[in-house]
Amino acid sequence: MPNTPGTASTSTTLGAPTRIVILGGGFGGVILTRRLESLVGARRDVEIVLVSRDNFFLITPLLFEACSGTLELRHCSQPIRPFLKHARFIEATAHAIDLERRTVSLTVSEGTVQDLPYDHLVLALGAKTNERLIPGSSQAFTFKTVADAIVLRNHLIERFERADVETDPVKKRRLLTVVVIGAGLVGTELVGELTAFVDEIVRWYRTIR
């Protein structure tokens, strides 16, 4: 969101640097910050600020392997600060944007609210699942975070444990049925990793074949 022609900068001090605020610490936000750093360098007339609710960068393509257990969860994320050479990082959640005042309201540690002025604002907050498109999908699992991968993995193991002692073949099959909604990159990669995961653990359950 750049300044419009004839609009003054939000900088309150004469000669203060132009501030570029980037909201979102995912691929888009981090890569853009790195790119701007390479363009701006050590110039003092430009300040780059990256804001994210997490102080780590999640490598989402590795979540599939973390869910199946072929990769340790700690390898799925890296601290954000070491990625940055000149940019400032703020761990906070953005909850409001004032376009007239050119400020972003941030909730930082312990619920403290602060206003961050900007000259240029970039939104790189990623996507959110729209559960209203498919009735009942709010009861399904999502797959976007490390926590999601852990929950899904534990749920699958719990289902295998229940199926192992279930004598009714219909109920057993239902316990072992997994439906993945979405055939894009996430859906297809997840199905592949889950298949490998099931092939690996099924040999430990004597009543499941």
Question: Residue locations for each model-derived region?
Answer:
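FAD-binding core/adjacent interface of flavoenzyme oxidoreductases
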Residues: P2-P17, R88-V179, F197, V202
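Beta1-alpha1 glycine-rich phosphate/pyrophosphate-binding loop at the start
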Residues: P2-A96, V178-V179, L185-R209
